[in-house]
């Protein structure tokens, strides 16, 4: 099951509406309660871009390091095949690049995405799990 940036960024954003859900899900991953969880390295890029755009360079280093060290979370690198699939998803379903990278990564694995983003429901073959109920 892929988790994407909507479960990573709330740890960084103060007062984010998904803060408690994010903490619970990431805690379950760390403690081994949720298994088989992975994320695309594109999620780390999103975190870096979000912090960079706010002038938070040191925080970007700290955040990426913390996520990199999160136990029981596998990081899946972008490959040329995943990038090609993402480009097709962008064209066919009108989603943004990062969502397309996440979708393509999930489709290359088990086709399951845990997210609150409704965009994934437009992509055939994906199963979307709501983190509020996992």
Residue ranges of predicted features:
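Short, well-structured N-terminal submotif of metal-dependent ribonuclease cores
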Residues: 1-39, 52-62, 133-134
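Conserved glycosyltransferase catalytic-site signature
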Residues: 5, 41, 80, 98-100
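A generic structural signal for short hydrophobic patches within well-formed alpha-helices
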Residues: 8, 44, 120-121
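Acidic catalytic patch
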Residues: 14, 38-43, 71-91
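Acidic, PIN/NYN-like endoribonuclease modules and their adjacent C-terminal/linker elements
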Residues: 70-75, 103-134
């Amino acid at each position: 099951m892929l988790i994407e940036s909507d479960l990573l960024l709330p740890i960084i954003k103060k007062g984010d509406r998904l803060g408690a859900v994010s903490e619970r899900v990431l805690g379950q991953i760390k403690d081994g309660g949720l298994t088989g969880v992975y994320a695309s390295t594109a999620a780390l890029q999103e975190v870096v871009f979000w912090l960079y755009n706010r002038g938070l360079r040191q925080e970007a280093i700290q955040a990426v390091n913390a996520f990199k060290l999160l136990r029981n979370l596998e990081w899946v690198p972008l490959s040329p095949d995943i990038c090609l699939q993402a480009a097709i998803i962008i064209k066919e379903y009108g989603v943004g690049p990062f969502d397309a990278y996440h979708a393509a990564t999930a489709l290359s694995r088990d086709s399951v995405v845990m997210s609150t983003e409704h965009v994934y429901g437009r992509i055939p073959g994906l199963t979307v799990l709501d983190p509020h109920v996992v």
